[in-house]
Amino acid sequence: MSRIGKLPIKIVDSVKVDINDNIVTVEGKRGKLSQEINSRIRVRVEDSNIIVERSLDDKQTRAFHGLYRSLIFNMVKGVSDGFSKSLTINGIGYRVEQQGTSLFFNLGYSTQFEYVIPEGVNIRLEGNTKIAVEGIDKCRVGQVAAEIRSLRVPEPYKGKGIRYDNEVSRRKVGKSGVKK
């Protein structure tokens, strides 16, 4: 039995779960998410828990068991609490501005970067160097944060770039060449 897959998912009072064929739909105060489930995996609601079971015991089905349990758990958590990732911009002259549904980044290049904010994700700016990415879909929030970070990955010498708030990046010592 999968260590993750065998754990039941607790349904919060404000969350409604609907299972039709191979589609699980979770609806809560923040929104609605749905996920198609592989036919080898069975999902059922029992009391106030979601139980994920597998029909076969081959390697691929065991992998799907834990995967779909985690996806459904993240859906339940997302529609009730939501997810967020925070990013910080470090560097002289590095900043971000929001205009409508686009972010404009000045990151030390000769041109500005324009990033169009996708549907289902909210972006909040705190000053011009802090970005908060929020939404109900954990995968989409993480993807948007990773795309923003990839515009200027932190470099190891001065630490300039866009980094996650909880990220610890390795710093290097610069050259210490001996003059002759």
Swiss-Prot record:
Regions that span the bilayer: none
Annotated family: Belongs to the universal ribosomal protein uL6 family.
This protein's UniProt keywords: Ribonucleoprotein, Ribosomal protein, RNA-binding, rRNA-binding
InterPro entries: Ribosomal_uL6-like (IPR000702), Ribosomal_uL6-like_a/b-dom_sf (IPR036789), Ribosomal_uL6_a/b-dom (IPR020040), Ribosomal_uL6_bac-type (IPR019906), Ribosomal_uL6_CS (IPR002358)
Subunit structure, interactors included: Part of the 50S ribosomal subunit.
Cystine connections: none
Pfam family, one: Ribosomal_L6
GO molecular function, one term: structural constituent of ribosome
NCBIfam families in the record: L6_bact
Gene Ontology process terms (BP): cytoplasmic translation
PANTHER family in the record: 60S/50S RIBOSOMAL PROTEIN L6/L9, LARGE RIBOSOMAL SUBUNIT PROTEIN UL6M
GO annotation, cellular component aspect: cytosolic large ribosomal subunit
Function: This protein binds to the 23S rRNA, and is important in its secondary structure. It is located near the subunit interface in the base of the L7/L12 stalk, and near the tRNA binding site of the peptidyltransferase center.
Name of this chain's protein: Large ribosomal subunit protein uL6
